Amino acid sequence: MSRLAKRHPDLLSCNFNQDYSCIAVGHKKGYTILNCDPFGKVHSNNDQGATGIVEMLFCTSLVALVGAAENQPSNSPRKLQIVNTKRQSTICELIFPTSVLAVKMNRKRLIVVLENEIYIYDISTMKLLHTIETGPNPNAVCALSSSSERSYLAYPSPVPSASSTPLSSSAIPAPPPAPTTGDVLLFDTISLTALNVIQAHKTPIAALALNSTGTMLATASDKGTVVRVFSVPDAKKLWQFRRGSSSARIFSINFNLMSTLLAVSSDTSTIHIYRLASSRKGGKDADDASTEEARSPTPSETPLASSPPLAGGKLDSHSAASSLRRRSYHLGKSFVGGVGGYLPKSVSEMWEPQRDFAFIKLRGNHGRTVVAMSATVPQVMVISSEGLFQAYNIDLENGGECSLMKEFALLGSEDFGNGSNGI
């Protein structure tokens, strides 16, 4: 998540770029771009004004900015600016009907997330291609693959209960329901089609992450005790990991660039790193593994290939997901009815989700955190709402507790002086 708790008096937001080589920081006077290794400032602008969202496009000079000043039209949270930091110029400005909650980019698409809508733009022309009506998503939970070829978008699917029936054509359409289920809708931003609805959890989705190649999706619910990894786009469950037995608020999930490790941070003092390459895969066994939130083994991973084409450049997530849910529900119900009576309740406990491979113990009151893994050295990087960047060494052979190697402040007194260096 890019928006962090405001524990540092000047920090408004902080996030890694797509390959975890840089950090984008928004603060009360503007924004700063930092290099991770070696750590250091690359660019700063202290004349921008309060900046709530800063999103980079890899290590290029293209940066998306969203203001954080409700009473200043030039720095409104409804205003998105695309700027070139090297030329110190504004490429375009867009105004939205409500506050922009998140911005995601890859080399083909720019995604703008509002509470009830997602806008998809062609990043080369900034032409609006598509609008998705999502229903309430106040935490802007979504993920965009950094891959240009598999430019998939994942977000919570506002799906009604499986037993609900569609409205008749004469009925007054109801607003999209809140995402009270743990379903995730997978959308192809290149073909502009819905691909799949994944029944990931039983409670609402709290965090999502797609790997760099767009082939895996990691999910966590608002209960925060289990993390699942699915293949994309066919939605086969690959792994299931136990974060802990008590509930926790998940702050961030990130794959490493090789998709062999998965890091998860939460409101607890422990950051978990899971190994993907050697863990026992989920498949059939892990479907019932979680005592927290396992779902019935319905064939929920049915592609939306048979769905009608989208009309008017707009996707109603409610309708698309409802169609899929009705098909999968009836088939799944008959399957469960046939075999459910033969399975003892304790069977679900036989397939305990995998525990972490390595972990980090954070010191003191760390606030909100974002975790990522370096692509160049065996290190786990953590940025926090305290305004700190920390790098921990990880033993890739044996795992265990990671050791703190270096720590830097994201903001210093020089951030509120003059001077700016382009990327």
From Swiss-Prot:
Motif (L/FRRG motif): 241-245
Region (Disordered): 281-317
Entry-linked InterPro entries: PROPPIN (IPR048720), WD40/YVTN_repeat-like_dom_sf (IPR015943), WD40_repeat_dom_sf (IPR036322), WD40_rpt (IPR001680)
Subcellular location: Preautophagosomal structure membrane; Vacuole membrane; Endosome membrane
UniProt keyword terms in alphabetical order: Autophagy, Endosome, Membrane, Protein transport, Repeat, Transport, Vacuole, WD repeat
Cellular component, GO, one term: phagophore assembly site membrane
Biological processes per GO annotation: autophagy; protein transport
Signal peptide: none
Membrane topology: Peripheral membrane protein
Composition skew (Basic and acidic residues), residue ranges: 282-295
Pfam families: PROPPIN (PF21032)
WD repeats: 200-240, 245-284
Functional summary from the UniProt entry: The PI(3,5)P2 regulatory complex regulates both the synthesis and turnover of phosphatidylinositol 3,5-bisphosphate (PtdIns(3,5)P2). Necessary for proper vacuole morphology. Plays an important role in osmotically-induced vacuole fragmentation. Required for cytoplasm to vacuole transport (Cvt) vesicle formation, pexophagy and starvation-induced autophagy. Involved in correct ATG9 trafficking to the pre-autophagosomal structure. Might also be involved in premeiotic DNA replication.
Domain text: The N-terminus might form a beta-propeller domain involved in specific binding to phosphatidylinositol 3,5-bisphosphate (PIP2), leading to the association of the protein to the membrane.
PANTHER family: WD-REPEAT PROTEIN INTERACTING WITH PHOSPHOINOSIDES WIPI -RELATED
Assembly and oligomerization: Component of the PI(3,5)P2 regulatory complex.
Family membership: Belongs to the WD repeat PROPPIN family.
Protein name: Autophagy-related protein 18
Organism of this sequence: Cryptococcus neoformans var. neoformans serotype D (strain B-3501A)
Gene from which the chain derives: ATG18
